[in-house]
């Protein structure tokens, strides 16, 4: 088994080694590169598909493989890589090849035309074709990685190359892997090509296949061309790209030193030194700057010329050295006269320009390597002129020592590596033996251990001295910083900003006060001041290192130009030459004066020696202006050492900046692409020079036309904004734009997420589906309750959507016209043509035709009315966006920018004119329709590019008139018909009367005929009619009528005529009677059946219902039988003992009332009480706690019988809990009730009666409803307390029992009797804790006892949460939730969070905990149970002097905090003697280090906003003086005697608190006089006072108008906005639109003479807003804000926070200022302020713990200086004793090896007794990963710690110091 496992292990290790070997990895990466198929494969496929022969296929494959092999070799072979990687090299190779390829393709046509070639020439041509195929595949394989973009897979080999040691083997194996992949790809391609001819569908179309094969070459050429054009369109060619304007060198020299990055040297040379410097060359400068040899020779010639000059010659020599391959040139002052200075410079610059044109190499001309080729955005810094190159991260690989080992750094500084290589080459004795890796590491470990040991010993020794309690040595034991002094005697240091020995957050910004213009403007000052100012400023620039956050003003401007020389000469004219000559003989040797030489000695600089040295520098250029000669005394060089910052050599601007800078000059094409915009001129002021008669010259000089223009931006998507012109577009993949105007780019993968794609934009699929299914199912939609309201809402919504859709359509149409070439000119000409046709041809023709028609119809013509309306129509020319100009003035550049034509008062042709009265009514209806815009088709539109509106028809009034006339004709016709009908009725009446006397004659005639029938029937035979009746019978008798009919017919023929008539008559009568009887019987039978069925159905239904009801009742009775029997027995039990309980409760009540009277007489309780106030729950609690083995609860109800209590605040959980505490009934009485989780169904009245007997609520109460104790009740209670509104993740992170203690637990209101039995064991523990505090007078013991108590029982924390659930209704006396239920008169019991407390207890105003719930809060959650917070939402004080803040707060919180309100017990001392003011314990006296801008809205005026969110996060550090005192600096709020009183009470109050005590004590006497009184009246007074003081903003301003002027108000608001808030003022959006509409009308009115009609019509149409016109010109800023014209909105800014600020924030968020809450941690400052408080002065209130014998630092390492501290932490962090010689640090990856490592958020911290010290150790550990980040920042070339954000809190060991 062992052998097998050994073999198996060896086999596994062998497999791992094989997989990790270089060969296998190379094969894998090479195989992956096969999938990077690019355009180079097109030639390979072309040879295979076109089937041009085996030779071409072989040549194509060979060329393809050869090209790929060269690419792999170029990775390893540097010259080949450089040759293939340089763009100009590849371009030089490709261009001739493409030219040859073009002629080669055309040669075939030439040879086919001539037909003179022989067989040999054809063979040669075929051979050349094979070679051409080889070259195509070879070259395009090389070009794939450079001209055309390569994929990630092709770059994998390059990436892994840097990790591989055996590079050649890796390259070979990767090539073999690629070859294998290529072979498989070609085999697959051959199978596909073999399958294509075998397919039946392809074989059936042989003609198409042959055509496709013949055109295959053309198809491949087209595909290749499209691919190249596509990629070249993204990456423009360097030759074709736009050439940017480079800053000329003369321009750079004339501007600033910063733009050109020059190193300026001011020198006065000796001949010897010049000779030495001419022969010396700086190798580093020559290597870096690449000076031309001709330039060097030119410099030598200039220096030789300088040697020939005399010693008295005055010479300025300016040397400008340009970096980054910029040519080096020199400008010399060749003439001695200052007047020829500019002339000499111009000549030299001109020569230099002409020289540079011929000197510029061809490569730089074709390929500008300084320009942008990538899609970079030109991020310009306003503090610099030229943009800085973003070249911080230079990927340069070099080996460097790291953690004791040689490692490859990919961002090693190139200059440093070059310098090290130069040193190794220069120093031949560099023979130091290189240690092995292990030896090097061991040496590094040893040195680190030694450093750590020494520093730890030093730290321990300092700590031991501090523990000896010698105050005199405390200052000495603190390690101090090294500072640079100005004066040793006065101990004046340099400012932290200027001190080079300090770094980090102390390095501030330097503001330059003196520039060239300032110096020139100060010529009138004295000479000494001028000299001192000039040269001190110069030395100031040399000495101090400038930060990036200041605006550079280089010193070249100070020495460059004639004005500066004149200034120097004037300033030195009154100073004698001898004085400077004598002073110049000073023995200082400052030949090479620099910053490093000053700071190396680290000594103080004497001011006197500074002055002498400065004067000594001046005597080199002393000038006597009388004889105009110069004196050269000594050669002194002052060199500026500046860091070379790589900058772009281009100064690019966008369109707006170009217009601003070049208003008078001719504007050039800007270099940056800005948002597409057009400048639309809306007004031109040409009237300013109309009255003056001037010449042409004066006109050209003075007649500057003023133009008012608007900028019209394009509404289409702008993806190219701020991109430099000529740079390639962003290579975005998987993004498509299918719309013409698309705001955002979308990926094709997310088309289903978009509402409407471009395929289905015309209709909605869901709507169609709903319609189909609705019709299919034939179901009508159900009626809704608020159907009408929803319909109106839907209509409004649809109207808005339609309006927005129309707006989008109009924008799309306008942008379409604006993007198409020459579209604006075509559209403009069409509009002008339509305007002319409408105005002068169509409308006059219609007027003429109408009036002629009226004349032909014999009506009066309306020439005057029509012509008047026609003349009234105005065709106003507008800009493209609708700004009106005039009828005759066209917009500027309207052919390119576009034009609109607006028709005012459009003419409408009418067949006739109405009277004036009726026309006025119609005008009012159509006042908004008296303008329109002309379309290109001559139609009228409401808006530009809108849909044409429906025009009124000419014939419509005619049709209406004809309809009216037809109606009249119809009316007349109907009248005639009515008359005819009436007459017809009369005629019929007469006819009826006539028929009345004819009827008797007829009857008589019938009677006579009957008589004749009796006498002679044969006589009337011919007159009779024979009728055969067939009776209607059922189907059974269907055959019978037929038989009867036949028989009857036979009988009729043969029988006697006399007997027939009688028989027939009898049969007819019989049949009629039979049918009638039968029908009646059937009808009666049907009716009877219906009645019987209805009755039976109703009976069945009633029976079923009764059965179901009985069944349900029976089931319910069975289910509830147990509880019913219990309740029945309990009801009998209660009724029996009801009287007994009532009598017993009355007796006990009387006993306790008498006892209470006796207690009130004593001095134990001195409570302020209200006679009409009953603390309901507290009385219950006290009476219950004072009753031993009692069976009832006693209520202490006052004598007022009109009190009603709202039981909505009492939950059923609380009632059940109280009931369960009764010993008699707990086991039996309400056991079933307590088991039921809801309101008990059958015992509601019983429970109410029981509660009344127990005194839980009054018998007269109207509110007897008891809430349910469901889980939802608990959730609702949590929702009411909005500090519990947390996310699920935060809830899981919380420890619920700790957080419940944190938020809800307060101090106890102690009971009167020391022997009283408390409600539960938790309250006993709290009382013991307070008793322990009282005995020891040490408030620090609270935390220690709390921590010990936490370890007693683990289930205690969970019981606490359940206990709170059971007792959350008891909100007064419970230590968990101490809130009062106070009733005044008939006032209902209200839910109140605010508690009446003693002196040391203050208000808990809850805040949202989810804003400050971070990791720091959860660590010490239950340490301080009584954290005090203050709600800054109530900080809306009025602006006046004497503010009764305490009374104001009492009124707002609905309680009263009285000074005389005390809480004492028999054995317990009161907790605090000092009454702290509410603003003191909040901790707002700290100095605010920054202004909160997380949500920066105004917090001083209540109408703006209150700084609530920022206060919620850090309630203890908000400076209250920023809220109030700084705004009232002109008011004397406090008095000094009040400060003295408070200082006597509390000698430990800090100096910052005095201001607040002044604020408090202004009304202290008034508050003391209040004493005890009626709480209700006090509350009423306070509320009234609060109402009086809390005025609105406008009332406050009215009040201030009496005291201050208008300017003071504006200054105050400006002060408020600028200093304390980061805000900006902007226009309201609606006001902005109204202003634009007014401007459009103003542009037209300015061009009109008579504006009355246009103004009135514009106001009627709503185009002109009168409220905007009423805005005053000099309106105050406050009034503009008040009226809503200006809106204050925040500015989102970024704050850079220093190290101290981060410390202060970290501790300030997590800790509450305990010395201001309860006086626990009152500090005593025994440390000297000059030394210690200078460093930690603002944080010392958080450092002390109140113990006189011990001073608690954050961590003991604070004894050391920050630099030493950081070094110690880094050495400890290395943990070198546990390391092995491995490649990784186990401290960062193996948590088990870390000592004292714990989880970051641990529920139970094993800490010392003093949690405060533990917490600070947690916050400031012994080492931090941030320190490593700071140490290694240069290894990574990054300026921030963003790379270490994930590992920032990886491990924080707590107590390891050494």
From Swiss-Prot:
Biased composition (Basic and acidic residues): 266-275, 1575-1595
TM annotation in the entry: 18-38, 64-84, 85-104, 128-148, 176-196, 219-239
Keywords: Chloroplast, Membrane, Plastid, Plastid inner membrane, Protein transport, Transmembrane, Transmembrane helix, Transport
Region (Disordered): 246-287, 1561-1604
GO cellular component terms listed in the entry, alphabetical order: chloroplast inner membrane
Subcellular location: Plastid, Chloroplast inner membrane
Membrane topology: Multi-pass membrane protein
Pfam families in the record: Ycf1
Keyword NAD found: no
An individual GO BP term: protein transport
Biological role: Involved in protein precursor import into chloroplasts. May be part of an intermediate translocation complex acting as a protein-conducting channel at the inner envelope.
Subunit description: Part of the Tic complex.
Full protein name: Protein TIC 214
Gene that this sequence comes from: TIC214
